[in-house]
Amino acid sequence: MNRVLRLAAPLIVASFVAACALSPGDSYVGGLETPADAQVLAAGMVEFVGAQLPAASSTVALDPTPSDQASNTLTPAFVAALRDRGFAVADAGQAGTAGTHHIRYLVTDLDNGDLVRLSIDGGAEASRFFVRNTAGGLQAGGPFTVRQMAEAN
């Protein structure tokens, strides 16, 4: 139990730190070590989105990152991976269209890897840690931890 607490505590703290610095509708991408990191993270993120939404009939809009992160490498990799999976990705002008699903993503460097947090329409939330392998590349450190928010009546 003590080991689990020691592993979970940094993840929880990193989640709170990333969330405190943002507006409620912002996404966030911390510094990625290599360009290949964006591809690995994007593929993992699309895996979760694909499990939650039907690709062929879903339009998604990504919550924007702050202006100082506009040139991050993850956002275009995530958009490309979503399109490759069959999702329609709305641009900023289409984001308010009825039926569009909103995705917020937070990526924070943590220990020897990156912590990814995703939410879809403020409902389904997921977290996954990506760890560096012995070759220096990122790989999933386990499955997504998913929390479904209860629907308001």
Regions found by a protein language model. Name each.
Residues M1-C20:
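Sec-dependent bacterial lipoprotein signal peptides
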Residues A56-N153:
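Intrinsically disordered, glycine/charged-rich N-terminal periplasmic/extracytoplasmic linker segments
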Residues A14-Q39:
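Bacterial Sec signal peptide processing site at the extreme N-terminus
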Residues P10, G50-Q52, T108:
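Generic marker of residues within folded, mature protein domains
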Residues S27, A38-T73:
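Post-signal-peptide N-terminal segment of Sec-exported extracytoplasmic proteins
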